[in-house]
Amino acid sequence: PNRQQQVSREQLAEIEAKHIAHELAFSDAVSGKFVATYCNYKKDIWALGPRLRPNRRGGASEQDNEERIKQRFAMSEKILNIRQKYYKEYSKFLTQTQIEKVYEQERMLMKRHAKRGKKMATPK
């Protein structure tokens, strides 16, 4: 892809937030709060560092595998804590139904990004 077409992850988070706000027909005031909160949420997630991937190569010792599993548990716990923190933030200006729909939209976007990533990874 053209370098000018590449979007920073901060810009992508803002685009995602605006898309979700538009899809859920938030008012301008709520949209502004949502976009800012969603972008902060994404920054907190990114601050955790890269996701730990399972060892697909094999050959790792039992101890290595145990350590990797424990690291993934720790990462999952940190992500859960961040999600709970932002759930409380969203609850200040969104209804519970709206929050549920935000999570649904977020899952749909993640699936779409995963599909795009696979398409780009496959040789033509």
Task: Give the ranges of each region predicted by the language model.
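Metal-dependent catalytic neighborhoods of phosphoester/phosphodiester hydrolases
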Residues: 8
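Amphipathic, charged alpha-helical segments and their helix-to-coil junctions
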Residues: 80, 84-124
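Bacterial Sec-dependent N-terminal signal peptides
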Residues: 1-5
